[in-house]
């Protein structure tokens, strides 16, 4: 990943639309989304397609657009570039978890993969839910619903996080 003499220049693809992935990468780089320069492409699928078709292409994306949900491997034509988390100039064994979606999800869940660029997602409401059906749905998300999280490409909550969130529903 260099532009030293004798090396080809990378083609950077970024989002042309506002999105959480760009916001988090901006934060990770100490910038904002608008500071990320490159060829603007619309949407997560657009970034993936642009990188797949350009041998010198590089971009960022949400995990579900980098890894096939069925095979749990990176999509054909995409290579996931690891982050040197401890900034020692190499990818140590503890940082090399990109071979499968499951190992990436575990690294995110355990806090090994940094946040940002990883981020939590929340359900929000104006005040506490008043309808029992809404509360029951939120409880389902925190219990039975957790078994569907990984297959949808998201990271399951830790048991202690679930307990904290369940307590808020009482």
Question: How would you describe each model-predicted region?
Answer:
Residues 1-170:
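Exported/periplasmic ABC-transporter solute-binding proteins
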């Amino acid at each position: 990943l260099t532009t030293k003499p004798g090396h080809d220049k990378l083609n950077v693809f970024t989002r042309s639309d506002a999105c959480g992935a760009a916001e988090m990468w901006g934060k990770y780089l100490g910038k904002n989304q608008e500071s990320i320069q490159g060829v603007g492409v619309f949407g997560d699928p657009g970034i993936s397609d642009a990188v797949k078709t350009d041998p010198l292409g590089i971009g960022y994306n949400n995990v579900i657009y980098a890894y096939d949900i069925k095979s749990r491997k990176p999509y054909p034509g995409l290579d996931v570039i690891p982050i040197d988390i401890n900034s020692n100039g190499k990818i140590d064994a503890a940082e090399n978890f990109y071979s499968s979606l499951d190992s990436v999800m575990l690294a995110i869940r355990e806090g090994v993969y940094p946040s940002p660029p990883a981020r939590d997602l929340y359900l929000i409401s104006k005040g506490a839910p008043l309808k029992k059906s809404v509360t029951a749905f939120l409880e389902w998300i925190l219990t039975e619903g957790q078994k569907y999280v990984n297959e949808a490409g998201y990271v399951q909550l830790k048991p202690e996080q679930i307990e904290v969130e369940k307590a808020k529903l009482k």
